[in-house]
Design a protein with these regions (language model features):
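N-terminal intrinsically disordered, cationic/polar leader segments
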Residues: 1-87, 91-112
Length: 112
């Protein structure tokens, strides 16, 4: 991963094989970021996204592998109980035009 700061903005390139949430956390801790918004695009080949079913009060995760383009990745960095916390949602599409997404649990970059 490589990143640069431009005032209050950070632009990052996460390398092939790296996990997105781990890299976001690394930057946030290194730069002492306590509050931020995030947006991203790129290609991934392995990701897990979840959905909270409010009527059941239960969380469900779905795991996907294959070639995907990130359609949207957006969210926030903040703190919870004084510790780093990120809340990101992602949608990713495959070569058939199918799009899957939800609360991002993990995603591996496949191309930069």
């Amino acid at each position: 991963m490589e990143y640069r700061k431009f005032g209050n903005t950070i632009i990052a390139r996460i390398d092939k094989g790296e996990e997105i949430l781990e890299q976001v956390k690394e930057i946030a801790l290194k730069e002492n970021i306590k509050l931020a918004s995030i947006q991203a695009l790129g290609a991934i080949n392995d990701f897990t996204a979840g959905v909270f079913k409010t009527d059941e009060k239960k969380y469900y995760s779905n795991h996907f592998t294959g070639s995907f383009e990130i359609v949207s990745l957006t969210g926030t960095i903040n703190t919870m109980d004084g510790e780093f916390y990120s809340h990101l949602h992602m949608s990713a599409g495959n070569d058939k035009g199918e799009v899957f997404g939800g609360h991002l649990n993990q995603a591996i970059v496949s191309a930069t």
